[in-house]
């Protein structure tokens, strides 16, 4: 049934505060309880506008103050809101950005309060029920309790308002007064019987809200009245989503009514207690404040916020310091460390908080202490240790605080943890030790501290793939590799995990070359898990020096790797476009080998299928024959020097210096470079030894009880060969003769 024109006109007159016209229509017999298209009664509309004369007129004509209007609201609900959204809308529309919510409240609160009290009294006198609830079961007392109007609350209580009435969200009026940080109203409600320990649907009590807004006075009041210090609330995710949608609705409403110029004031209103009448919870407004931090456990929030006074109050009233937040299992002890609240940590320990509590990730406070800045972490670790903390407890990933300290390069924490007896060899779920983390994240200072401590086993790892030496190689960190080698790390993982193959495949020639020259035990004849030999990867690098190093370290090109397959044939089959210099080098090596092995036969058969290879082979073989013809003595030839070049000693060759100096290496150009590396130092060594012998003849004589000059020349050389060339040169130099004491050699 539609609304009559007369009723519509009457509503228009009410909105315009036209008392004369309203009286005229009412006297014509129009029902004062009629509703408009928005489902609002005339009385509710008049109350919303705060038109006292029209309200009185409607009541005098029989308007019922208990009829529900839009959102199940009664006029008494409306008048309990000291500053309604309609008023705010008008202000914004009229003044735009010139008006602020705080300014308006400060200026007009008392005026609004007095006017609203007058209206409320009129409604109650005309039968308004004070315990009526709206669609969210919010009563006028709930609204008044968050409005800041002590007098309005007092009026409602005087007429029997229920202090323990619950909203649909399970909240009493105390939740509303506390969330508005109103000490006086909260105290009044408690005096009138409000239960201080009622928890809403998210298990949030008034005390939790008081801690949330950091109100020391409210916390004291509630604790004095028996509030449960150990209540645990829940996160309010669903509530936040719901209220965000509600915010969008109010913004749409304002936009529809062209109230969209003062965004700041709108947001302030949405986050204020003035809008509580349309919220699901008293705590909703708090969520939209920039400084908001949700509280589920009073003691943890007090610690998070760094409120020493609040924390001590809670603990004094018997709060358990070891209650954790349900969603994160985080304790106050964790927050004291994470937020760098040293005094808070001290307070918690003083009240016997457990130092080794674990959160959801099984981290202890010590795990977080090592993540603090280097300048601060040890201070927290020392306090924790003094209180009995263990530094060997592991988290969900099997890591101790030392693992974490190494990961974050907290060198001071690493030193302190080691000094405190922390186990340096615990392996986590990734098979990482603390050393692994230091190497993995390239924390060179930390690696040095760990290795120099003498407590670390550099070879400890469950899988060779995660060996520190392999990690260092993967990260191309030569400094860490040096430290590990100096600490005696086992180099087997390099061979077993194909570390050299990996470097060659990645074209990391610098580190590959350095490792080959530095570590003598490296395997150069192995194949990786793809059955590719190291030499094949090196051949693709086109770096002849690295290939030479492989050969010097024992690359066996005749090694049989399969049916009719050798290391040499694999290099050619796996590598395309080999450089001429590398081909010549490989052929020269084969040509110098004995001709009776199975591998040699396979290689020779392959060489004979290629004209270029065969030509190079014949050239090399010709030069090998020449070297075999150059005899140095006792059946020893130049080819013997070449074949034994990796093991032959310079002192041995020095004895053949006279013969070596007469050899023209230009006759063997392919092998010349490798022979010169041996022959030139041998000739130089011989000269130094000979000069040292003569010097010794001059400075040592019989009357000084030395019998040097009586020794055969061969014995003299044998003795001098024990000295390195540097010391021999010092002996020869006239300025240092008197500084050298050789008596320990001869006596």
Swiss-Prot record:
Repeat recorded as keyword: yes
Gene3D superfamilies from the UniProt entry: Ankyrin repeat-containing domain (1.25.40.20)
InterPro entries recorded: Ankyrin_rpt, Ankyrin_rpt-contain_sf, PRANC_domain
Residue spans crossing the bilayer: none
ANK repeat coordinates: 38-67, 103-132, 136-165, 169-198, 202-231, 234-263, 294-323, 328-357, 361-393, 397-426, 430-460, 464-493, 495-524, 529-559
SMART domains recorded: ANK
Keywords in alphabetical order: ANK repeat, Repeat
Name of protein: Putative ankyrin repeat protein FPV222
């Amino acid at each position: 049934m539609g609304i009559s024109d007369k009723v519509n006109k009457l509503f228009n007159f009410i909105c315009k505060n036209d008392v004369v016209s309203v009286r005229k229509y009412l006297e014509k017999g129009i029902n004062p309880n009629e509703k408009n298209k928005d489902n609002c009664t005339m009385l509710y509309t008049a109350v919303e506008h705060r038109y006292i004369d029209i309200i009185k007129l409607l009541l005098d004509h029989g308007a019922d103050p208990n009829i529900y209007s839009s959102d199940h609201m009664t006029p008494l609900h409306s008048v309990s809101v000291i500053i309604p959204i309609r008023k705010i809308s008008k202000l914004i529309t009229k003044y735009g950005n010139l008006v602020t919510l705080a300014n308006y409240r400060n200026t007009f609160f008392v005026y609004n309060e007095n006017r609203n009290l007058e209206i409320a009294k009129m409604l109650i006198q005309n039968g308004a029920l004070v315990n009526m609830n709206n669609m969210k079961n919010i009563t006028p007392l709930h609204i008044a309790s968050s409005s800041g109007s002590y007098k309005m609350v007092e009026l409602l209580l005087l007429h029997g308002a229920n202090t323990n009435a619950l909203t649909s969200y399970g909240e009493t009026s105390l939740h509303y007064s506390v969330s508005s940080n109103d000490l006086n109203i909260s105290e009044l409600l408690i005096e009138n019987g409000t239960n201080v320990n009622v928890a809403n649907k998210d298990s949030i009590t008034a005390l939790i809200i008081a801690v949330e807004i950091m109100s020391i006075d409210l916390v004291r009041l509630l604790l004095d009245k028996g509030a449960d210090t150990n209540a645990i609330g829940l996160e309010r995710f669903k509530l936040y989503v719901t209220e965000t949608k509600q915010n969008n609705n109010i913004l749409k409403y304002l936009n529809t009514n062209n109230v969209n110029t003062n965004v700041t004031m709108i947001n302030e209103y949405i986050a204020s207690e003035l809008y509580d009448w349309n919220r699901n919870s008293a705590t909703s407004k708090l969520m939209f404040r920039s400084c908001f931090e949700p509280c589920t456990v009073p003691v943890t929030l007090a610690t998070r916020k760094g409120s020493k006074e609040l924390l001590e109050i809670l603990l004094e009233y018997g709060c358990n310091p070891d209650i954790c937040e349900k969603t994160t299992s985080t304790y106050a002890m964790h927050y004291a460390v994470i937020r760098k609240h040293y005094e808070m940590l001290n307070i918690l320990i003083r009240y016997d908080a457990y130092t080794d509590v674990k959160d959801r990730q099984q981290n202890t406070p010590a795990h977080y202490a090592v993540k603090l800045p280097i300048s601060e972490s040890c201070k927290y670790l020392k306090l924790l240790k003094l209180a009995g903390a263990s530094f060997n407890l592991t988290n969900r990933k099997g890591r101790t605080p030392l693992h974490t300290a190494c990961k974050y390069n907290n060198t001071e924490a690493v030193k302190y943890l080691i000094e405190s007896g922390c186990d340096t060899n615990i392996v986590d779920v990734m098979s990482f030790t603390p050393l692994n983390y230091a190497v993995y994240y390239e924390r060179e200072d930390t690696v040095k501290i760990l290795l120099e401590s003498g407590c670390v086993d550099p070879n400890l790892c469950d899988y060779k793939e995660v060996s520190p030496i392999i990690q260092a190689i993967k990260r191309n960190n030569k400094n860490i590799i040096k430290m590990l080698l100096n600490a005696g790390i086992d180099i087997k993982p390099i061979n077993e995990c194909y570390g050299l193959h990996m470097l060659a495949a990645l074209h990391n020639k610098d580190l590959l070359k350095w490792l080959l020259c530095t570590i003598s035990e490296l395997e150069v004849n192995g194949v990786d898990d793809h059955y590719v030999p190291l030499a094949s990867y090196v051949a693709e690098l086109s770096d002849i020096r690295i290939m030479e190093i492989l050969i010097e370290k024992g690359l066996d090109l005749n090694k049989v790797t399969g049916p009719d397959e050798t290391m040499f044939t694999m290099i050619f089959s796996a590598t395309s476009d080999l450089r001429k210099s590398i081909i010549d080098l490989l052929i020269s090596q084969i040509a110098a080998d004995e001709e009776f092995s199975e591998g040699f036969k396979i290689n020779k058969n392959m060489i004979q299928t290629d004209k270029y290879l065969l030509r190079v082979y014949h050239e090399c073989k010709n030069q090998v024959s020449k070297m075999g013809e150059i005899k140095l003595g006792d059946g020893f030839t130049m080819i013997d020097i070449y074949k034994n070049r990796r093991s032959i000693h310079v002192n041995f060759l020095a004895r053949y210096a006279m013969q070596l100096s007469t050899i023209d290496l230009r006759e063997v150009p392919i092998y010349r470079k490798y022979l010169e590396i041996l022959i030139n130092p041998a000739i130089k060594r011989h000269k130094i030894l000979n000069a040292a012998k003569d010097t010794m003849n001059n400075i040592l004589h019989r009357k000084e009880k030395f019998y040097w000059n009586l020794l055969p020349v061969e014995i003299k050389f044998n003795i001098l060969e024990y000295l390195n060339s540097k010391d021999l040169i010092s002996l020869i130099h006239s300025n240092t003769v008197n500084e050298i004491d050789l008596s320990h050699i001869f006596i």
